[in-house]
UniProtKB/Swiss-Prot annotation:
Family recorded in the similarity comment: Belongs to the peptidase S14 family.
InterPro entries the UniProt entry points to: ClpP, ClpP/crotonase-like_dom_sf, ClpP/TepA, ClpP_His_AS
Membrane keyword on record: no
Function: Cleaves peptides in various proteins in a process that requires ATP hydrolysis. Has a chymotrypsin-like activity. Plays a major role in the degradation of misfolded proteins.
SUPFAM superfamilies in the record: ClpP/crotonase (SSF52096)
GO biological process: protein quality control for misfolded or incompletely synthesized proteins
Predominant subcellular localization, coarse grouping: plastid
Active-site residues, record numbering mapped to chain: 101, 126
Enzyme Commission number, as recorded: 3.4.21.92
Quaternary structure, from the entry: Component of the chloroplastic Clp protease core complex.
Record field: catalytic activity: Hydrolysis of proteins to small peptides in the presence of ATP and magnesium. alpha-casein is the usual test substrate. In the absence of ATP, only oligopeptides shorter than five residues are hydrolyzed (such as succinyl-Leu-Tyr-|-NHMec, and Leu-Tyr-Leu-|-Tyr-Trp, in which cleavage of the -Tyr-|-Leu- and -Tyr-|-Trp bonds also occurs)
Localization (cell): Plastid, Chloroplast stroma
Protein name according to UniProt: ATP-dependent Clp protease proteolytic subunit
Length: 196
């Protein structure tokens, strides 16, 4: 039996009456938001609009992005990453469960010194993939060139944000590399592992 989205009480500052709002609405008001699904344009646009709105509302208070995602669309994930770099408040990233593929890219995009992984979190990095095997030859070549450009961009970001040499990052991206929270910390993807 599904429970739906829980409702929690909320009282706006200066108001006497308490209203019931869904839990995500309440957490957004506290500047906490979640990437708990595959990354696509819909969730990307929702997170981007939240970050922009909350940074306009108050540009000195940190934002907190909790990540438990298998990854998803590369361009949508890169849009989230770019927004995190653009907004004035620091975006703290918290990896919990799984941060794989483009979700690990978003995780590494948090403010330096403010990237955290829960103790049992898993992180996975790899090279971007495509389904160009279904395309005709001309499209195949164009898509392969675009994929190579995206891979170079992602590699540069990992190098910049982890402090690892380009050859280490490039080698790791050749295949699926799964890491524990402490391994992700040693790799420079997160700065801290939350204490159990």
């Amino acid at each position: 039996m599904p429970i739906g989205v829980p409702k929690v009480p909320f009282r706006s500052p200066g108001e006497g009456d308490t209203s019931w709002v869904d839990i995500y609405n309440r957490l957004y008001r506290e500047r906490l938001f979640f990437l708990g699904q595959e990354v696509d344009t819909e969730i990307s646009n929702q997170l981007i609009s939240l970050m922009i709105y909350l940074s306009i509302e108050k540009d000195t208070k940190d934002l907190y992005l909790f990540i438990n995602s298998p990854g998803g669309w590369v361009i949508s994930g890169m849009a989230i990453y770019d927004t995190m770099q653009f907004v004035r408040p620091d975006v703290q990233t918290i990896g919990m469960g799984l941060a794989a593929s483009i979700a690990s890219f978003i995780l590494v995009g948090g403010a330096i010194t403010k990237r955290i992984a829960f103790p049992h979190a898993r992180v996975m990095i790899h090279q971007p993939a495509s389904s160009f095997y279904e395309a005709q030859t001309g499209e195949f070549i164009l898509e392969a060139e675009e994929l190579l450009k995206i891979r170079e961009t992602i590699t540069r970001v990992y190098v910049q944000r982890t402090g690892k040499p380009i050859w280490v990052v490039s080698e790791d991206m050749e295949r699926d590399v799964f890491m524990s929270a402490t391994e992700a910390q040693a790799h420079g993807i997160v700065d801290l592992v939350a204490v159990q």
